[in-house]
């Protein structure tokens, strides 16, 4: 069994959180990761790298720089059709599986209660190069065969937003800027804003599934 052994890439993390030392205090983080419901607008940093040596994945920090989520793929050569989205202690929050529906591919998120969501690209007859859309169908509708979108992801350049069925913004993800210089930290460092009264573990699971459709993990 692979043992989780976080590696401290100090130079990179200093650029992301210049005011923090690394590694973080895990006992402090453990007390703060639950519940997952946002009480106010919250920001998270998504680092598209794994802390496990020679692995692919991503690492998610809260606004204080505490590690809260991670994805680690121990096969460094390629992704399998099944990916695990975990909390900092390695507890699996969502199992993400790639599905093929005829000519179309989708990613589905499962947890202990069953299928939670399915994400698939919306294909347009006259697509615009500057944008693309994905629909997210939640668990109960997947079981009933209802393909009506519960959420929608709209991608414009380096920014993408998650909206509910009425068009209300739920979350937005974009490249993060340095707190010191204001410079773009690159495609590997993202900032995610999540609106109040939302399950940010579910939002993050959807973001991971979206990144998998674009082979960005």
Curated annotation (Swiss-Prot):
Transmembrane segments: none annotated. This is Protein LURP-one-related 3. Might be related to the phospholipid scramblase and tubby-like superfamily of membrane tethered transcription factors. It comes from the Eukaryota. It comes from Arabidopsis thaliana (Mouse-ear cress). PANTHER family: LURP-ONE-LIKE PROTEIN-RELATED (PTHR31087:SF81), PTHR31087. It holds the Pfam family LOR. Belongs to the LOR family.
């Amino acid at each position: 069994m692979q043992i989780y052994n976080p590696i401290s890439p100090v130079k990179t993390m200093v650029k992301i959180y210049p005011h923090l030392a690394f590694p973080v205090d895990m006992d402090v983080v453990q007390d703060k990761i639950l519940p997952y419901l946002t009480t106010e607008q919250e920001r998270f940093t998504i680092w598209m790298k794994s802390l496990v040596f020679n692995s692919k994945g991503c690492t998610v920090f809260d606004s204080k720089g505490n590690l809260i989520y991670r994805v680690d793929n121990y096969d460094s050569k390629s992704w399998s059709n099944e990916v695990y989205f975990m909390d900092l202690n390695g507890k699996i929050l969502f199992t993400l599986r790639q599905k093929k529906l005829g000519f179309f591919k989708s990613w589905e998120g499962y947890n202990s209660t069953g299928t939670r969501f399915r994400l698939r690209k919306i294909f347009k007859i006259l697509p615009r190069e500057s944008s693309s859309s994905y629909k997210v169908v939640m668990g109960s509708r997947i079981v009933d065969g209802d393909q009506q979108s519960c959420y929608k992801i709209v991608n414009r350049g380096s920014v993408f937003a998650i909206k509910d069925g009425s068009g209300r913004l739920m979350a937005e993800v974009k490249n993060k800027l340095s707190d010191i210089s204001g410079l773009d930290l690159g495609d590997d460092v993202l900032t995610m804003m999540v609106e109040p009264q939302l399950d940010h573990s579910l939002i993050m699971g959807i973001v991971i599934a979206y990144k998998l459709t674009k082979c960005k993990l």
